[in-house]
Amino acid sequence: MFKKILIANRGEIACRVIKTARKMGIQTVAIYSDADANALHVKMADEAVHIGPPPANQSYIVIDKVMDAIRETGAEAVHPGYGFLSENPKFAEALEAEGVAFIGPPKGAIEAMGDKITSKKIAQDADVSTVPGYMGLIEDAEEAVKISQEVGYPVMIKASAGGGGKGMRIAWNDNEAREGFQSSKNEAASSFGDDRIFIEKFVTQPRHIEIQVLSDGQGNTIYLNERECSIQRRNQKVIEEAPSPFLDEETRRAMGEQSCALADAVGYASAGTVEFIVDGDKNFYFLEMNTRLQVEHPVTELITGVDLVEQMIRVAAGEKLSIQQSDVQRNGWAMESRLYAEDPYRGFLPSIGRLTRYRPPAEIAETGRAVRNDTGVFEGGEISMYYDPMIAKLCTWAPDRAAAIEEMRVALDSFEIEGIGHNIPFLAAVMDHPKFISGDMTTAFIEEEYPEGFEGVTLDEPTLRRIAAASAAMHRVAEIRRTRISGRMSHHERHVGSDWVVKLQGQSFPVSIAADPDGATTTFEDGAALRVESDWMPGQPMAVLSVDGAPLILKVDSGTSGFRVRYRGADLEATIRTPRQAELAARMPEKLPPDTSKMLLCPMPGLIVKVDVVEGEEVQEGQALCTVEAMKMENILRAEKKGVVAKINAAAGDSLQVDDVIMEFE
């Protein structure tokens, strides 16, 4: 067994590999860029080597720099994680030439499966079901349009060396094919150093289901069930689960056997994932094979009990698999929510900055339930614009799907993140969505259920009453505290009344509070009463309460007349006033926000890649105005309506912040 391995990656996956290596008694080496000098993976590793500036193409994906770090530290093997160099055959070749083990598949398998065109041909030869499309190389946008017309819209434009949702676009017409080809080509070049593009038919309303395979390259190949990955945004997975609520035993076995056949056809050795799209009739089609550890591997580990990182290390060290197909369990149900640094209320645009508060829920592994949080960040750390915006992977396990979802709800409620935008409200909303709960979902779930983007959740009346009762009880505690530090003489404090009006989601709830040493009873106008118990104190960002014996966890920010309350995807202003104050407030005119209707604002921190218009140009609704790159993704900003460009304030190469004015219109 290896004595020392280097992890050629960063963030949560580097931390994940370090944990298993430590368990196996193997020393670890981290690599880091300038931006990651204080990163968690650097702190966790036994050694760390600096490899360059923040951009990945000047540090993490520069093979020579990684090889220098290997030589400097004497590492015997390298785990590539996912992304970066994990599926780069030249890296595997460089390691082989150096006599260093690659904790992954052979170079030939990476090469064959890393090229989407070649992999599809191999899959067809191995009798794996495939999607129709054009597998040749495409030279320019006009050829892409012609091929798209021949295949028939809609089509998927994909980077041959792509993955992780990058270098992929769906096109429904010639214009989208033309623009999608160029954006995919640019993203592919910057993310993978390979700008080859291919086009295939886009299967509408599919599910995305993948099979985890494991092979030792010595005649033993097994599959470890499937993962359902249909909850996606821009082809980037958001929520995964294992097993799938859709598959039956016959389809599961057929997909597993075809996946193993494909692995054997390319001489595979290590952990790998074969991705399929599955239609409503359970017909499945090969999508791609990822020759690396997947981001979502924890859900497989939770239902099988197999440590996939350990298996990868053992196979790389020449060991045979210690488990056979008959040993593979499917125990219970696991969920994974990807926590991203992005603002769901602003079209999921990337968010960067410092984590002023980072308190994940406690990790649990006990009979009947489990909570796991794979992360690479810490409180006080920075979320950088240079890398993927994932903060953490929050996983739960329970005996069945409904229980696993409930565990996830509670875990998301308990997760505290401040300082940056994050998608916890959206994840919480999905967990409560009827379609998700029923398992009735496709890869179009997010765009169909949130066609105008995520605007928060509208809570029902019983939930609003629970939050109103809790808010009133917390406000009473805050008011009592304020009277005690008012500067008045003892025994002359301002009296805290019992009657309040709580305004939530546009509704007013007149309530009366009767307090006792153990809590408070909030009585509504109609006579209904709710008992609230909590040890919450003013200033605490999370309130863990009991309302009529049922738990309620709220994220709270104190204000002058109440709280900002966040709960299960709802972001509410809870204003709490005396009846007289509420009466007067109702007569006050609303303050209108500034008019930005004639401006194009930068929706995220990022870099202007190109500006498509000039001053004085008349633009049409939907016309591309400029492209902003952030978190390795290109975002085309379009005109919301017809108009004339009056002034352009930014040029290609400019770095902008959120709400910077890019251009103004007449």
Residue ranges of predicted features:
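N-terminal beta-alpha lobe that positions the nucleotide/phosphoryl donor
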Residues: 1-274, 278-297
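Catalytic cores of soluble metabolic enzymes centered on carboxylation/carboxyl-transfer
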Residues: 259, 298-530, 658, 664
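Catalytic P-loop NTP-binding/switch module of NTPases
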Residues: 551, 557-602
